[in-house]
Amino acid sequence: MDFFDRLDSIRARWNVLEHPFYQRWSEGRLERDELAFYAGEYRHAVIALADSLSAAAADAADPDSGFDSDEAGQLGEHAAEEAEHVALWEEFAGILGADVDRSPRPETRACSESWTAGRDALEGLVAAFTIESGQPAIARTKLDGLVDRYGFEEGPATEYFSLHADLDHEHAAQSRELIEERLADADLERLLEVAEGVLRGNWELLDGCDRAAGRE
C-alpha cells in the first residue's frame, strides 16, 4: 500500500462527513445557534490552514529545503489565497451572528495546533493536502445543506463553500505532485502522523461543537 493509499485509509477512519454534526447539517436538523457556534469555532481552523501554508512557504524558501524558488513561490501564493479566505468565512459567520472573537474550545485549539504541526515544508504540505483533498466533497455537502435546508441563497455568505468545492481540486493536485517528488527520502510514518492529526483534529472540533450544544 503506497503513501496516499495509507492516507486514504486513515481518512476513512476520521471521515467527517459521517460525523453526527455534519449529518444533522445535511438533514437540516441543526439549530441556527449551533451553526453560529460552529462558524465561530471553525474560523480558527480556516486561519490555521493559512498559517500552516505560510510557514511551509517560508521553509520552502530556504535554499537547503529541497524546494526550488518556483515551488516556494507557488506555496506562497497558495498561502496568500487561504489568508484571503478568512474574510469569506467571516461573511458566512456574520450572516449567522457568530461570535468570532470568542476564545476557542479546547477541541478547536487542538485542531488548530494539529493543522499547524508541520515542522518543515513537506510536513506542512502534507497537512494542507490532507485538508484540501477532502474539502471539495465537504464544502459541497455544507453548501447544499445551507441552500436546501437553511434558506441560504448562493452569494457572499456561501462563497467560501462554493469556492472550496471547486478550487481545492487544483490545490490538492498541486500539493500531491510536490509531495510525490519527495516521498523517497521522507519519513513516511511521521508524514502519516501529521495527516492523522489533521483528520482527528477536525473530527474532534465537531465533537466540541456537539458538547457545547449539550448533545454529548
What do the PLM-derived regions correspond to, one by one?
Residues 1-216:
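Non-heme di-metal
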